[in-house]
Amino acid sequence: MIFYFSGTGNSEGVARIIADRTCDQAVSIVDKDPSSYSFGEGDRVGFVFPVYAYAAPEMMVEFARRVEVGEAYSFAVCTFSNVTGDALEHLGSFVRIDSGFGVKMPDNYPVLNKILETEESAIQKLKAAEHRINEIIPKIQAREAGVFDTLRGDDPHEKSSKGYPWFNENGRSTKPYWVDEGLCVGCGLCERMCPAHAIELIDGKPIWAKEICSMCMACLNRCPREAIQ
């Protein structure tokens, strides 16, 4: 079984491709009870997630640490746009991981006021990601252990998950979010896909009902009208 956490779809896409090629099942961890899953010798368990602040998202950490991996072969795949930092090691401090891999995907984090992908660069990254996944799958099928193939970055101290507690405390506020009511059509997609259930539709318009969210960027990236700012 392959568990994934995905906001914009990058990690979900990777998880589903791997699951399809390995005759496995891809399962979103959102609203799932980790204690309802247990595995043993001969089983295979995967965790696929995006890199947040050079670490694993809190929702993935809280899920993985409560899953009974047992003697199953356990692997992790993290998706990233720049470098992975020590995201796999971070998750590995909560759950046993036999091998881990990184897959570079298009950037979808507009919070830092930077220019995201052009269509051309996104297509190039997706093609490279397909090749990368094809490299990873045989290693998973062979249950290779001790393989940690990621892109940590030039400065392992700078690209460290040590800053993740700060991100959790200060970087997940919903206060900056707002909706352009001239563009919003009240479709409710943002409310339905928010993994933190932080969005509610009031009078046909989204409001952020929680002070903290996952900062997954699903609402920003998937709004069909680009109404969420």
Predicted regions and their residues:
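A mid-sequence, solvent-exposed acidic-amphipathic segment
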Residues: 154-195
